[in-house]
C-alpha cells in the first residue's frame, strides 16, 4: 500500500479501512446517535483531561475553530510568515474570525520569545489588539524542524504573563 503524507486531503483509505468503515455503526451525532463519534470524543476528552472534545473532519476545520475561540473581530494573531494557518487555509483567519495577522520570520518556521515580545502591538486605538500567538511544530515549510520544549515553555510563560492566548498547532503535511 502506498502511503502519502503530503496532506490529509490526498490520503486514500486501504481496503481494510474501507471495510471497517462500511461495518461501523453510525448515527446522527447531532442527536447523540453516533456511538463511534461519541466514543472518540469521550476518549479524547478523558485522555487530555478536558471537560469535552469535538471531532473535526479536517485539520483546517480544527485550526479555524481554535482560532475563532481565541480571537475576536478586529484582533490580531502573531504567527510565522510560512505558517499553515496563514498560507494554506484560504484566508480563514480574516474570513472566519475577522482578525488580522502579524507575520514574523523565524528559524525553520520557529519563533522565539524576543520576537513575540517585540511583535505585540502597543495599546493604541489605531492598531489591532494582539490576542493570540500561534506556534506550529511542523513538517511543513519548517522542513521538519520542531521547537525545543524549553522554547515553547518560555514563549508560553511570557504569553501568560501578559494575558495573551497561545496555541500550538501540529502540522504533518509536506
What are these regions (language model features)?
Residues 5, 44, 62, 93, ...:
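Buried hydrophobic positions in well-ordered alpha/beta secondary-structure cores of metabolic enzymes
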Residues 7, 31-33, 54-57, 79-80, ...:
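General beta-strand structural signal in soluble alpha/beta enzymes
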Residues 13-59, 81-82, 86-87:
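Conserved N-terminal alpha-helix of the aminotransferase class I/II PLP-enzyme fold
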Residues 51-71, 104-105, 137:
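Conserved core of the PLP fold type I
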Residues 69-87:
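Conserved PLP-anchoring active-site segment centered on the Schiff-base-forming lysine
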Residues 88-100:
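Active-site-proximal loop->helix
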Residues 97-140, 146-154:
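PLP-dependent aminotransferase-class I/II
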Residues 147-174:
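Catalytic PLP-binding core of fold-type I/II PLP enzymes
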Amino acid at each position: 500500500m502506498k502511503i502519502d503524507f503530503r496532506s490529509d486531503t490526498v490520503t486514500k483509505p486501504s481496503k481494510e479501512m474501507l471495510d471497517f468503515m462500511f461495518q461501523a455503526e453510525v448515527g446522527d451525532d447531532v442527536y447523540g446517535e453516533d456511538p463511534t463519534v461519541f466514543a472518540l470524543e469521550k476518549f479524547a476528552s478523558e485522555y487530555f483531561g478536558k471537560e469535552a472534545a469535538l471531532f473535526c473532519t479536517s485539520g483546517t476545520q480544527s485550526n479555524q475553530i481554535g482560532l475563532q475561540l481565541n480571537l475576536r473581530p478586529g484582533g490580531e494573531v502573531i504567527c510565522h510568515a510560512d505558517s499553515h494557518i496563514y498560507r494554506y487555509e484560504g484566508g480563514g483567519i480574516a474570513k472566519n474570525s475577522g482578525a488580522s495577522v502579524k507575520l514574523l520570520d523565524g528559524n525553520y518556521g520557529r519563533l522565539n520569545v524576543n520576537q513575540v515580545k517585540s511583535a505585540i502591538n502597543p495599546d493604541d486605538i489605531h492598531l489591532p489588539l494582539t490576542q493570540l500567538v500561534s506556534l506550529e511544530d511542523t513538517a511543513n515549510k519548517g522542513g521538519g524542524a520542531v521547537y525545543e520544549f524549553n522554547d515553547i515553555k518560555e514563549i508560553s510563560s511570557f504569553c501568560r504573563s501578559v494575558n495573551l492566548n497561545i496555541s500550538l498547532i501540529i502540522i504533518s503535511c509536506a
